Regions:
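Periplasmic-binding protein-like
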Residues: 122-129, 196-239, 257-264
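Ligand-binding clefts/hinges and TM-proximal coupling segments of bilobed small-molecule sensing domains
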Residues: 26-28, 154-172, 204-213, 239-264
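Beta->alpha turn/N-cap motifs
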Residues: 42-46, 81-86, 95-107, 151-152, ...
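Acidic, polar ligand-binding/catalytic clefts
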Residues: 68, 72, 77-140, 207, ...
Length: 264
């Protein structure tokens, strides 16, 4: 069953761009309400954030729940469009989703291309390794191969960290988290690196999460750069939910503990 799910996840990632239906360019809040449907790009392979059950087809996670909360505020239905780190930007650019809520890290470079709301979650990056490899810290990864997701900033962050510590790494980029965890289990890579909360969903009897973490970063809801109307509306919602405890309820629901700060 797991193999079928992994294959399904890969196929949906490849064909997601073609399958998604276009939405109106620079969709306003009023447009969405008139349409009666909010179209949101979400992950489908990240437990606790955006995960699609292969048996029932239902989504769960703080990000899919957050999308539903936005839809409830607008009094419309929500439609989830599965995305990856590779496809979430193009789908937004091509007006096939209204927004992305998909572990999209806020960076200065990305803010030149897209609008981001205030952060709804802060997480640090880490490493998942096979227990049998006896890897205990980042120094043990010197010269080894680290798997990262295509389209993510993880490789750059690890390289910067390695430069500071005098370490060098090899990298393999893969299109989805199921591909990465499969490669780790098969010992084709020595470690799988992404945000720690994402990695926590893939811990098993065979794997463990290293204590080492690096570069805490913020996730934001993403809209097109030109769509200030929708971004302002969403930012107000995130700010409100941060203050009234709604975001904390989401963290508690999925047993998540955000990092308390963002690294310099």
């Amino acid at each position: 069953m797991k193999k079928k799910f992994f294959l399904s996840a890969i196929l949906i990632s490849l064909f997601g761009l073609a399958a998604a239906k276009p939405v109106q360019a620079d969709t306003t809040v009023a447009d969405i309400q008139k349409r009666g449907e909010l179209v949101v790009g979400v992950k489908q392979d990240v437990p606790n954030f955006g995960y699609k059950d292969p048996k029932t087809g239902t989504y769960s996670g703080i990000e899919t729940d957050l999308a539903k909360m936005v839809a409830d505020e607008l009094k419309v239905k929500v439609r989830y469009v599965p995305v990856t780190a590779q496809t979430r930007g193009p789908l937004l650019d091509n007006e096939q989703v209204d927004m992305d809520i998909a572990t999209f890290t806020i960076t200065d470079e990305r803010k030149k291309l897209y609008n981001f709301t205030s952060p709804y979650y802060t997480d640090a990056s880490g490493f998942l390794v096979n227990k049998s490899a006896k890897i205990k810290n980042i120094e043990d990864l010197n010269g080894k191969t680290i798997g990262v997701a295509q389209g993510s900033i993880t490789q750059r962050l690890i390289t910067e960290l390695g430069t500071k510590k005098g370490l060098k790494f090899k990298f393999v980029e893969l299109g989805s988290y199921p591909e990465l965890i499969t490669s780790l289990h098969a010992h084709r890579i020595d470690a799988f690196s992404v945000d720690r909360s994402i990695l926590s969903g893939y811990i098993s009897k065979r794997t463990e999460l290293l204590d080492d973490s690096f570069k805490p970063s913020d996730y934001g809801i993403v809209t097109k750069k030109s769509n200030t109307d929708l971004n302002n509306y969403l930012d107000n919602l995130v700010t409100k939910w941060s203050k009234d405890g709604s975001l904390q309820k989401l963290y508690d629901r999925y047993k998540l503990k955000p990092s308390s700060h963002t690294a310099d």
